[in-house]
Curated annotation (Swiss-Prot):
Lineage: Eukaryota, Metazoa, Chordata, Craniata, Vertebrata
Stored PANTHER family: BETA-SYNUCLEIN, SYNUCLEIN
Summary of the function given for this chain in its UniProt record: May be involved in neuronal plasticity.
A matching Pfam family: Synuclein
Record keyword Cytoplasm present: yes
Protein name according to UniProt: Beta-synuclein
Length: 134
């Protein structure tokens, strides 16, 4: 009987040790998983921020080019229609610089709404969740 009890005791110790190792292994695995997820999340966030900044810069550049073309075109139209003489049109202005300044300056007065029109958000109906049909 002594041998039997000693054998069970040893088995019990082995099970406890295995459980402890398993618990430790699961904890380590969970910690590494968490680190991995946080790493991927931070890299994704950096990529998104960099992408948004890049798109914003390209948009600003394109707006500057478009503004320059509009400015130049407006001068040509004004001269062609006789509103101003070609000689009176300032020659030292560079359309790209004027467009760049216009893009960087904030509006002095906010844009006004046309009379009688309202741009308030319409009330939303309550969201209703639908279950897919089987």
């Amino acid at each position: 009987m002594d041998v039997f009890m000693k054998g069970l005791s040893m088995a019990k110790e082995g099970v406890v040790a295995a459980a402890e190792k398993t618990k430790q292994g699961v904890t380590e695995a969970a910690e590494k998983t968490k680190e991995g997820v946080l790493y991927v999340g931070s890299k994704t966030k950096e990529g998104v921020v960099q992408g948004v900044a890049s798109v914003a810069e390209k948009t600003k550049e394109q707006a500057s080019h478009l503004g320059g073309a509009v400015f130049s075109g407006a001068g040509n139209i004004a001269a062609a229609t006789g509103l101003v003489k070609k000689e009176e049109f300032p020659t030292d202005l560079k359309p790209e610089e004027v467009a760049q300044e216009a893009a960087e300056e904030p509006l002095i007065e906010p844009l006004m709404e046309p009379e009688g029109e309202s741009y308030e958000e319409q009330p939303q109906e309550e969201y209703q969740e639908y279950e897919p049909e089987a």
